[in-house]
Amino acid sequence: MWKFWVDRGGTFTDIVARKPNGELITHKLLSENPERYKDSAVQGIRELLGLTQDAALPDNMIEEVKMGTTVATNALLERGGERTVLLITKGFGDLLRIGYQNRPKLFDLNIVLPELLYERVVEVEERVNADGDVLHELDTAQVEKSLKEQYAAGFRSVAVALLHGYRFHEHERKIAKIAQAIGFEQISLSHQVSPLIKLVSRGDTTVVDAYLSPILRRYVNQVREALEADKGGCKSLMFMQSNGGLTDASLFQGKDAILSGPAGGVVGMVKTAKELNIEKLIGFDMGGTSTDVCHYAGEYERSFETEVAGVRMRAPMMSIHTVAAGGGSVLSFQE
């Protein structure tokens, strides 16, 4: 059976395949070519299998597909995620906008705040103290009324981040049940996405998850359907996470997908270097869109709280420095 390892970048998609006889082959194609194909990863796999555009995928032909993708990264950079509404404890509606009040350029008079990913805020009547004791029961009628208004306004994704929600989960769960009954398609709860203290970090990460997960889910379902993963066409479909680990397609979340593409390069660099007994490395990964630089000295370097494209989040990811200086970014044509 065939095995495929796919790196879907901003400019090119690279594929390494192992044939049933053990032979390794490579393939490269443009990541975006809408006139010829819908998705580069699927198209590349079909080309390597020798299938025509309309040919069905034979059963039991693909053993596994492992993929790193920049779909979530691009959606974040281009602000192309799902329209999201934030539900937060009453009195804290501006908290994520205020943030931590960090000012990298202290003396700048013209301060440009990063664009928020959520469009609207609903302040929820409820209150829990730091010990997890309920001070004010959740007003479910108010939540239902507010969510119905947001649903009517076209929102389908909701992020729920309540004060001390990491300690007391019940109020967030009740909100999720109400939102689900109304018809919201994406419901991200802070105690599931980032079950730790600090409401700002927890809220930011929950918003990122609600904003990106629908886009990611649509892409994953598109790939799964094209590879007929549910019908025996592909036995295993896995995606690279920002932390350098793989996860099943059904568990791939927005908050874990930001560095899905570059993280695979770091892991590949380290594995290759170890075969040569090299322990100290600087990685330089120049693609068509951006250049990624990383460092390795015996163990993977990961950050837990970081900022990507002006968005704060708290999720484990590889420490990778990215600059917009890929081959296509720095080269230009002259007659």
Residue ranges and their predicted role:
Residues 1-335:
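N-terminally biased helix-coil "hinge/interface" segments that flank
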